Amino acid sequence: MKSTLVKIYLMLSILIILGMNLQAQMFRVRIKDQLHTENFDGRLLLLFSNNNDSEPRFQVSDALNTQVVFGKNVDHWIKGTTQTIAEEAYGFPKERLSQLPAGDYYVQVVLHKYETFHLKNGKTVKLPMDRGEGQHWNLAPGNIYSTPIKIHYDPKNADLVELNIDQIIPPIPAPVDSKYIKHIKIQSKLLTEFWGRPMYLGAHILLPEGFDTHPNVKYPLAIFHGHFPADFSGFRTIPPDPNLKPDTVARFKIAGYNRIQQEEAYQFYKKWTGPNFPRVLAIEIQHATPYYDDSYAVNSANMGPYGDAITYELIPEIEKQFRGIGEGWARFTYGGSTGGWEALAVQVFYPKEYNGAYAACPDPIDFNHYTTINIYEDQNAYYAKSDFKELARPGLRNYLGHVSSTIKETNQKELALGNNARSGDQYDVWEAVFSPMGEDGYPKRIFDKHTGAIDKSVAAYWKENYDLTHIIKRDWPKIGDQLKGKIHLYVGDMDNFYLNNAVYTAEDMLKQLQNPSCNCEVDYGDRAEHCWNGDHTQPNYISRLRYHQMFIHKWAKEVKTRAPKGVDLTSWLY
């Protein structure tokens, strides 16, 4: 009897201790009256940092030195009321507040605001509308946040920490037209209909030298795909600023990279305006969505007909306003990473509308290699498993193969920033682009965000609609004549995100294509990281700044082999 009572006492003691730990210290958040202008929906983020190098909201990443974030949804936050962040908030890299070690931290809260969309199909969703920043929760104008304070945090402490939201992120000024760079913004009829509210597309246009003095010339269109551009990048009409304070880029281990960028931008200006540079219109597109900083330039169940809107609404309007040739043979695409995937995808899905795709380090173009996951054969995205072993799948490496993040960790970070694919980050946007829409109006998960279990029905949908390697092979009898000679792929064999793996199997498939043969180009950079683009003569940190001059020249030399007979191949080469 005595022994039994002792056991019961010990069990109760353990449960009490566990219960105390599961409570953790709580945070109560209120909004300054002047900022609480309406009832808010959104994601409330609580951020911790053990240093004061920058605000905590700028220190969350996939890197080993990431700081900490916890998130919870807020629905209809009424003015004058408070929100409590406690143990149920989901976090990264610690999942729960009770797991965060006691210590001194700089603490901050951010409210990432959501808006309500009534979709064409009758679904209603709450999402963060892009506000000119390119879908960054820590930079989005209108988001509100607290001034960081230093506290001593102890998960065993029952004291309530008060946090006051007293700051708002200001609007971002619109870019200004100049002699060479112009800007355009249109309301898309297709996207407005899908989203149930006005939706816009924009672009930055770099005009060729002599545009005004050659009023009768019409120009080819060079389309640089990539992440959200605040303005046309890498073009500078004045020499580098001699007083510019040099920065340090840890990735490249280079001091003064900002000076290198300015010098490269100035050199590009001199080449662009000098003799022997092909005279084309070069554009960078703004197509941020409520899910990400761009749409991936294709039609999607969750994001709408961005492919059609860009190809049939935006591009013709640009060509109309700025004297583009306006025919598929005179358009080509290039880009890296997300832009690399987009460059290839639009060429495949619109084979007659574009005449060349130069895709560097593309996002996964074969879902047998969805980074380090095979969505068709693997059962779990986070772990390779056997009867006696479980191995975490790597997600981020350097050129030596040293791993700094796993697939699970990256997705844990995304889930802390937002559920229902609302983090504005990488794996979430792939689901927003590639997945069917769920019954709740949000993208269906390719894998469970908590466990990593892969949904094979979603994988089958991905394969038939967005696996570019599979689609090219499947549709080659129909589109081969329109694609031959147009596909160019480049990737480093030590890409940080393992994107080279998909290119390997894509290359194997392309080599086997017949009637016609592909006549494609695939090239690899030895020990090159993300995002190597085909230049064997320069280090990655230089070549990544030279997309325009590299691929505009390359296309201008190749176009004569793919252009229809009788078209104008000379007037724009003045």
Show where each model-derived region lies.
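Short, charged low-complexity linear motifs
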Residues: 13, 31-34, 292-298
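Non-catalytic cap/lid and distal C-terminal segments of serine-dependent acyl enzymes
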Residues: 50-52, 58-574
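Residue-level hotspots within well-ordered secondary structure
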Residues: 41-43, 47-51, 55
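Contiguous beta-strand segments within globular domains
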Residues: 25-31, 37-44, 198-204, 223
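Bacterial Sec-dependent N-terminal signal peptides
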Residues: 1-27
